[in-house]
């Protein structure tokens, strides 16, 4: 399995969770296969917690600042947040910059060009098929090796003065640990008002973690940073070391139990019967969401996220 194919796996999971009623996403139908299989309840639940928690932070970030905000998505693939957020907050308030491998960029660009509902969200745009890029007022897509950002900068224009959050959904973990560290430090140094949201597995050395790594390795997928950051506390210390002022890192079980409102939990739990409760709890403890921020961004956003404690 090529790393580029992991985006298709994630797409199938999001599509299943959307069709089952966990997630509201009117744009995923343009990307998902017409005959997408239903995922087991435990997978739908994990996809929901992942999507809800990331949306929770990013949307509160958008709502915490006036004027234009910027989201830089590493390994964005078929992620539909750009369309969901622009339709809700308006193109004048958001700039998305997305990076991925060439096949994933081309797949997204061609899907955008096919569907008016997607084109309307981003407005006028310019496409370079040979380079795998799309540039518009609210969305830029680049086929670009993110490791080169540290040495060569961004391939297009980036406004370093805008409040900015970098998003990595299982992307940084594919880099060598020193490469991931260099990139995170670069982001922290270059943006005055910034944060980073990172979703990735943890606890790779226990029995479940070893099984998870073996399954991924059998498919040709190696998470190179997994063994470096075993716990949520190690993830927290990692980003403090990068220079961020405030960091919170929680596993998915904690997020489900303490972040998600009771009524929302009741709604999602009524969708499907989850028989594998112990398996879910074990799985949820092996995935972590980290949110790190500069002091000025944290002080602004924490008013919208009073339940987050560092």
Curated annotation (Swiss-Prot):
Its catalytic activity?
A: [phosphatase 2A protein]-C-terminal L-leucine + S-adenosyl-L-methionine = [phosphatase 2A protein]-C-terminal L-leucine methyl ester + S-adenosyl-L-homocysteine
> Entry's Gene3D superfamilies?
Vaccinia Virus protein VP39
Fetch the SUPFAM superfamilies from UniProt.
S-adenosyl-L-methionine-dependent methyltransferases
| Keywords tagged on the record | Methyltransferase, S-adenosyl-L-methionine, Transferase
Which EC numbers does the record give?
2.1.1.233
**Cellular-component GO terms for this entry:** mitochondrion
Molecular-function GO terms, alphabetical: protein C-terminal leucine carboxyl O-methyltransferase activity
* Residues that, per the record, bind S-adenosyl-L-methionine: 50, 75, 100, 145-146, 169
Q: Is this entry keyworded Nucleotide-binding?
A: no
Tell me the enzyme class.
transferase
Instruction: Report the InterPro entries cross-referenced here.
Output: LCMT1 (IPR016651), Ppm1/Ppm2/Tcmp (IPR007213), SAM-dependent_MTases_sf (IPR029063)
Which Gene Ontology biological process is one annotated for this entry?
methylation
Q: What does this protein do?
A: Methylates the carboxyl group of the C-terminal leucine residue of protein phosphatase 2A catalytic subunits to form alpha-leucine ester residues.
Q: Which family does it belong to?
A: Belongs to the methyltransferase superfamily. LCMT family.
What name does this protein carry?
Answer: Leucine carboxyl methyltransferase 1
Q: Which gene encodes it?
A: ppm1
